[in-house]
Amino acid sequence: MTDEALLTQVLMPYKDHCKYLRSAVVTETDGRASARCEFEIPESCYIDDTGHLNSVEVNICYNQMMYYLVAKSVKEGLGTGFESWTLEDFWKHQLPDILIARFSSNFRRPVNPRVFSGEMEFRSVTRRAPAGGSPFVHADTAFRYWDADAGRCDGEATLAFVNVP
């Protein structure tokens, strides 16, 4: 079940017409958290209607899904590498310190942006401390989107959480 108060706070940094994530259910399997989400994009925030989900929207949806998954994992103490974090830590680090180091997406069939589903999972989350550098959390993730008409998109992203508590 979606934590509505948490979702509202996670989406606070977004302009109203860019809040695409409508619901999210977070689960944990074998110590890894994942989220299954529902999205709606009534109108693109930057371009005339293309009739399909595009790469900019895929990235925005990924960000919203990822922020919710991390916040929920922190709040519920899920084993995703954020056990020492508090929600205050998350709010402090949400925008300046959670970086997408690598992002790739594959469009298999056009996805209807008006109503579609998505999911993401943490494949690995590790704390790293490079010699002479500041510690950070490295996370490999996978995601996918689909719609009722067999539209499909999937991809992978690598995250770096810097200035970690």
Swiss-Prot record:
Q: Which gene encodes it?
A: scoD
Q: Which Gene3D superfamilies match?
A: Rv0098, thioesterase-like hot dog domain (3.10.129.30)
Keywords tagged on the record:
Fatty acid metabolism, Lipid metabolism, Lyase
Which biological process terms from the Gene Ontology are attached to this UniProt entry?
fatty acid metabolic process
Provide the species name.
Streptomyces coeruleorubidus
What EC numbers are recorded for this enzyme?
Answer: 4.3.2.11
This chain belongs to the protein called (2E)-enoyl-[ACP] glycyltransferase
Q: Which family does it belong to?
A: Belongs to the FcoT family.
Give the transmembrane ranges. none
